[in-house]
Amino acid sequence: MIIDHSLGLVFLHVPKCAGTALRTAWQDAAEGRDVVSFFDFGFDPVLQRQVDLAHQPLMDLRHRKEWRFLRRYHVVACIRHPYQRLASACREYYRQHSRESELQMRREPPSREQMLHYLRRLPGAMDAHDLRYVHGFPISWFSHYGSKPMVDTLLRCGQLADDLNALSARLELPAALTAQLQRVGAGDGRRPSAALDQLERDPDLRALAHVLHRDDFRCFGFERSPAQFEDPELKQLIEQSLAIGPSHALPLPNLTPQMRWYYGRSSHRPEPVLRPTRSPRTPR
């Protein structure tokens, strides 16, 4: 996350959505402005767990003092198709896993075995808010507080150059920042990496994206392609987790539509209808 107090603007860093390049552009053009960048890892004493300060889900960010700036300032976030995000998140997991796997990711994409290892563990990691898997969390966790949108302007990776030009014009951004953002839109600053086309088309990856990122497809209008699980272990995990059943028989309690307790009570998971951005506000 970047907070530009001089411009009254917050950039929410949604993982694997050009955030690193946009963050760098903002910092490179920050001379003379009051710009604060949140980065690195740390232990949050309120949440009592490790967090990635660069991109925290808004449910985690809510208790921080910086939350007031999301309410006060113009908030910008960049989004990307869930298939592309999940493939990139898988690669990022191995970039951070070890020096050996980081070097591998520079040469080639994750193998199918590596991908399945990651996909099988991602649902449980989401339940636990495990920061090692933060890049695979849904977009809506970073753009919405519950069902409430907190973003004013969305940028889309598929049309980033046009969206950045429109943002600069609409907010009348400084010339130096506009120039840096144009460089990002032109593709400057992208890290070299192996192509992920095959991973993005993998049926298990797509099928899992349909489950874990279902709100992203509906909220942001991303197109879905038919996909079925082919990996037996992953298929069994998701089928059992999506079942309506006894509380202590569910492998993952946060995916079930209804958790039933033996003494007769049950808790239902709502199906929210999310708006992509918040309504225009009167400047404060």
Question: For each predicted feature, which ranges?
Answer:
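Membrane-interface amphipathic segments in extracytoplasmic regions
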Residues: M1-R284
